[in-house]
Amino acid sequence: MPDKTVTFSLKNSDYESVKKLYTNLSLPDIAFKGEKGKIKLVALDKKNSNSNESSVTVGETDLEFTAYIKAENMKIIPGDYDVALSKAKIAHFINKKVKVQYWIALEADSTF
């Protein structure tokens, strides 16, 4: 994995609450956003500024960034994860209890 720009822990309960929203509201995107000292996991439609948007705080940071992932690409088994985001537009998810990890591409318009 290229240099890790941002690292944090993602609780299963936080991910599942956002997953429920993007599934029920048919939101195509999720984002990890670093702003005002917080890392937020956001369900949204980045192409429609009038769409619903919901977020949960998952960590703290001193960086400003937005890392977009297509919701359809978030096919991970339930569990708590250590997450690393890279400026090279890669997200790395490592399950804390099961020996499984995922590398998921970030969208091209992600910014760090």
Feature-to-residue mapping (PLM):
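DNA polymerase processivity clamps
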Residues: 4-112
